[in-house]
Structure formats: C-alpha cells, structure tokens
Amino acid sequence: MAQTLLKVDNINVFYGNIHAVKDVSFEVNEGEIVTLIGANGAGKSTTLKTISGLLHPKTGDVLYKGKSIKGVRAHKIVEAGLAQVPEGRHVFLHMTVEENLDMGAYTQPASTIAPNKEKVFELFPRLKERRKQLAGTMSGGEQQMLAMGRAIMSAPKLIVMDEPSMGLSPVLVQEVFSIIGTMHELGITILLVEQNAKMALAIADRAYVLENGRITMSGGARDLLHDDKVRKAYLGA
C-alpha cells in the first residue's frame, strides 16, 4: 500500500476576519498526481500556502510523512522534501537560469547539485540552451519551466504546483502538462492546483473540488471529468 505523503486534516485558515479555508481535509499518497480544482477565490492557493508553511491554520493540522509540519518554517519544509512551484512563477529575474537553479538546491549537499542540474536539463533542454541568460528576459513559458526546474533541484518527494498554466498560450499549456507527466514518471508525487480543470483532471489520479473554501466533491479524476456537475461548472459542458 502506498505511503500517505501528505495529510491535510480539517484545516481552517483566515485572512484577518475572512474565513478562506473551511474544514478542509484530503490526502496525497506517494506516486500520485492529485489535483485541487475550483473557481477563483475558492481557497485553492490559500490551501497550498498553508501546506508550504507560508500561512498557518487557525485549527487543524498538516502532516508530511506522518509528522506535523504546522508552524514549521517554509525552508525547513523544503529541506524535508516538499517543494513548491508558486503561482506567478516568482523566479529571480536578475539572476541567470543557472543561478536560479542553484538557488533551488540550497538545501542539498554540494555533490548532488551537478547531477540534479543535468536531470533538469534533460527535462528542459531550453533551460540548458539558455543557462547563462537572465531569467527576466525569458518568456512566461520559459520562466514556468525554470520555476519547475528550480523545485526539482531540491530533490523533492512531493511538489505542490500553483496554477502552472496561468498566462500561458494553449501550446505552452500542453507542453507544461506534458512535462508534469514526465516529472511524475521520474517518481515525483505532485499536488496540482489548476483552474484549467480539463487538463488537470486528464493528468491526475484523484481530484478534489473546492468551492467557497470547502471541499464539495472528491473522487477519481476520470470520474469527476465525466461528472455532470463538474462538467457544467468547470468544463463548459
């Protein structure tokens, strides 16, 4: 039986007086791609920020490999093997591609940096071609690849991705999702937050639907892909 890598246990998260995430619980098992889908403002990004240690739940808990990471600093969570690809990419614009990748490896032994970088360059040949280019001069799609590559540099067991298709052309969206599939084949477990519900459900094993801060549906991704309520609300069908 696959190990439960991540367990979100009945968390409640507030922004001031705004109750953004309400009694949310779900699990991500080793080897899975799990997706959270929902409209803008549903609480998806807030949930990911809570998992990554950028926000703290008022009640409830977040467990990684069976241990609570509630209140643990974000960089310690990365050291434990849980990396994030944030919404909007957030690459270091005035640093080169290679320097950005090196920043992703700050928690790793020096001996692992070169082999991990080669793994990234195999996944993203364009990054290898542009390794000396400033990140700020790259296209949005290239910056997204760099953000994903930087996460891989920390040798994670689990990567949480926040809206990786945001702002990208349809062609680049296809490319990014293809790369997510390849990352999964390399043994990386993935928690994916994505507004493009059709693409997310097509690639995921399981899915949860967030509405107004609550999980309203869950199940196999293929089942939800063909569910009439999901199709009407999120797939334009």
Could you say what each language-model-derived stretch is?
Residues 2-237:
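Glycine-rich phosphate-binding loops of nucleotide-dependent enzymes
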